[in-house]
């Protein structure tokens, strides 16, 4: 039986669990895409049907997979469990002419022996909804980039690009920057005091009310603050009451794609691309202290499943 995954690292990890009865090969990612030098999408009649081509660097891989699939009893498509992975499996079936009757889709969210055994015990067919979702995203990416980028070349400079997500994100950044520039700072003051009760530990308190008024008092400038301080000095204070309560702090939930990138940026100063590259390696499997290759995390692209 033939098993197709995306990368050699993933192939090694999966192959270790499956054993020699399975021939595990890597497609090296997508094997087909829209043509580089033309739109590749039918827009004249507004059908928006894409035309795909096998990239020159993938022709040898497709040829080898086609030959292996023809001689295999069953072809297991074990690409990633999201719309990109589903689309890769669909493109493989089309490009390598894999017989629909012998093709089976297996999905796992972690590369462990238990997860792989479960996936291969419960294969399914291709999810056409996920495939169509990926195609819609790819077509939109091409239409926006292909049509708008030349406008930017003429208006701004050559090489400037537009994108379905990129352009919206840039607009949000620009709008936020305008808000920052238009912000008029307003001076305000707060008053805090450190109390030293006789024989007790010190504690701090903030001025939250004057003469029983509701709401924190507004102190617009230093003069107002000094006036309030003059009234407060020499006054006797008493603790009118206190409250103790037990609080529970829940552990943080497991990372999703966005929170993983945010924490890696905050703690380690990693870029989003570096974070995802490292996460991909941890998912597909790495060698630890000379041991066999093992996958260490679940699938990291939670926003596209």
Describe the residue ranges of each PLM region.
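Hydrophobic alpha-helical scaffolding
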Residues: 4, 55, 78, 82, ...
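Long, highly charged, low-complexity internal segments
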Residues: 23, 32-54, 162-284
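C-terminal or mid-to-C-terminal helical accessory/interaction module adjacent to the motor/catalytic core
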Residues: 70-71, 111-198, 241-248
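Glycine- and acidic
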Residues: 72-76, 154-156, 240-247, 258-267, ...
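Extended, well-ordered alpha-helical scaffold/bundle regions in very large, multi-domain proteins
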Residues: 270-305
């Amino acid at each position: 039986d033939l098993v197709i995954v995306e990368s050699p690292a993933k192939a090694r990890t999966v192959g270790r669990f499956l054993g020699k009865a399975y021939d595990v090969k890597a497609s090296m990612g997508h094997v087909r895409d829209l043509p580089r030098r033309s739109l590749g999408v039918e827009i004249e009649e507004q059908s928006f049907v894409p035309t795909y081509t096998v990239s020159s660097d993938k022709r040898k891989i497709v040829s080898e997979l086609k030959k292996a699939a023809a001689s295999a009893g069953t072809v297991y498509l074990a690409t990633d469990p999201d719309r990109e992975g589903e689309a890769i499996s669909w493109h493989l079936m089309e490009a390598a002419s894999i017989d629909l009757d012998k093709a089976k889709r297996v999905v796992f969210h972690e590369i462990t022996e238990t997860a792989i055994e479960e996936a291969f015990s419960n294969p399914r067919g291709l999810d056409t909804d996920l495939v169509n979702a990926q195609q819609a995203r790819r077509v939109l990416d091409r239409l926006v980039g292909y049509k708008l980028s030349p406008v930017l070349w003429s208006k701004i400079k050559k090489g400037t690009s537009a994108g379905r997500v990129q352009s919206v994100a840039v607009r949000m950044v620009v709008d936020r920057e305008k808000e920052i520039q238009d912000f008029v700072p307003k001076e305000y003051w707060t008053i805090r005091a450190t109390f030293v009760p006789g024989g007790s530990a010190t504690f701090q308190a903030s001025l939250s009310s004057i003469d029983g008024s509701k709401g924190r008092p507004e102190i617009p400038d230093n003069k107002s603050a000094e006036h309030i301080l003059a009234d407060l000095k020499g006054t006797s204070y008493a603790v009118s009451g206190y409250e103790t309560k037990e609080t529970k702090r829940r552990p943080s939930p497991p990372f999703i794609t966005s929170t993983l990138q945010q924490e890696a940026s905050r703690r380690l100063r990693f870029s989003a691309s570096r974070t995802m590259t490292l996460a991909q390696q941890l998912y597909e499997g790495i060698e630890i202290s000379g041991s066999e290759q093992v996958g260490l995390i679940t699938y990291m692209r939670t926003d596209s499943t």
